[in-house]
Amino acid sequence: QEPVNLNVATREQLEQFPFLSDIQIEHLLAYIYIHGQMKTIYELQLVEEMDRQTIQYLLPFVCIKAINNEPAFRWKSLLKSAAKYGKNELLTRFDIPFYRRKGYEHTYLGPSVYNSVKYSFRYSDRLYAGVVAEKDAGEPFGALHNRYGYDYYSFYLLLKDCGRLKALAIGNYRLSFGQGLVISTDYLMGKTIYASSFNNRSGGIKKHSSTDEYNYFRGVAATVSLAKDWDMSGFYSHRSLDGVITDGAITSIYKTGLHRSQKEADKKNLFTMQLTGGNVSYQHNRIRLGITGIYYLFNRPYEPELTGYSKYNLHGNNFYNLGIDYAYRWHRFSFQGETAIGKQGWASLNRLQYSPVQNTQIMLIHRFYSYNYWAMFAHSFGEGSTTQNEQGYYIGMETSPFAYWKFFASFDLFSFPWKKYRVNKPSRGTDGLLQATFTPRSHLSMYLKYRYKRKERDWTGSKGTLTLPIFHHQLRYRLNYSLGDVLSSRTTLDYNHSHSQDRAANIGYQVTQIEAPG
């Protein structure tokens, strides 16, 4: 609804698109700087490193408009324009099962209907506001522990680019700085088939408008421009969390947000957490530096059971993390990374990207997350779900040597220095991926992907005395076809093969067909 005008787009706006590499962004900004305003969207074909498929991905989100000298920012003008041109949207979702599920016969306290309501207001890319309400299937509505109606409510207000005030969030918001080793509530794409998607950009402050009941902060956050190349961010959050309290201490944190049964409802909002911190960043031409620090504490001590694989997990009452992130671009090379410390341990992630020729990228990533690094809100690249107890080397290559074709290959070698769930000793593994994508038309595309993974796991029934390698082979073919705005079709064929040493293999097949209005 509000495409980005490329003639005035900033680096931060372009970095929101995961399919754009740092080099492509650099060449796009340089093209406009050298040649002046674009007259038509088709000029994207003249930008160095901009391939056909990337342009196709970009077209729905951008536009070309002539610009004049903009007047200085005025709050009165912003509010007046927002009242006149702002857009309102109301969305609701109902999920009604056509059969009686087992859990609703005795266990769950509410009906099997899921319902969410989202109201949002938006003006340009400067003002966002909204309210979210949600009731999961099985949760009561307007009764018992939900006497005020829904089980979850969320409010957010976000202002952006208001003079020196680059961002202001009130209510629920999300944060991401550096490579995510200190704090990141962004959704990562994982080991995807686009090398450009691994470019963790400093996302800063964002609104929280989803129904995720755990992965957000509640309070206030702001980013201010101190000088031309300097920004400073500060934030504070105070919110209740779900969990289990035993003898006055928190023994587990409950992250699902489900309160369907009495047992789940008894865990709701049992303790509070406060968090404060900040970030200072410097960016000039090809260099970017930043420092991020956070401090958070619970109103009760957090004392989970620390045995076996969880021996070095987070515990205590108050915690901190401090990290330095850095990035530098030189010709066809791009280097970025972050190194962080906590109350225990340290972590570091560094990546080097090289584009030897147009439409080809090579990515190298090294990460080291010590087994005793505590970072409750960190979220970064890795095989595991946390930035703890992992180290590895990753290499990926993406190239488009022919028209309509794109090839991707990657290999990841990783290890876990300490025990993990269902692995009673230090372990290691590998992960390889090959993919070929063919896009002959804008409405027709297909790909073939093969993935191989080897990981170690305790054999069932061995009580941790026998650890065997598990081999996974996955093959997928997918065809996407659309008839304009009328119909979109997706056909997927999946084959999975899994086996361990001297054990029988598990084999599975699946055919999926999805038809939806365009």
Predicted segments — roles?
Residues 1-141, 145-158, 163, 172-176:
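Compositionally biased linear targeting/interaction segments
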Residues 80-87, 126, 162-168, 177, ...:
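Short loop/turn motifs that connect adjacent beta-strands in outer-membrane beta-barrel proteins
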Residues 147-242, 359-376:
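Outer membrane beta-barrel
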Residues 134-152, 206-213, 266-269, 340-342, ...:
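Outer-membrane beta-barrel proteins
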Residues 143-145, 194-197, 252, 303-313, ...:
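Solvent-exposed loop segments that connect transmembrane elements
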Residues 214-262, 269-281:
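Aromatic- and glycine-enriched pocket-lining scaffold segments that form the walls
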Residues 204-212, 247, 262-270, 275-277, ...:
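Extracellular/periplasm-exposed beta-strand and loop segments of Gram-negative cell-envelope proteins
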Residues 108-112, 271-304, 311-518:
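Exposed, low-structure sequence patches enriched in small/polar residues
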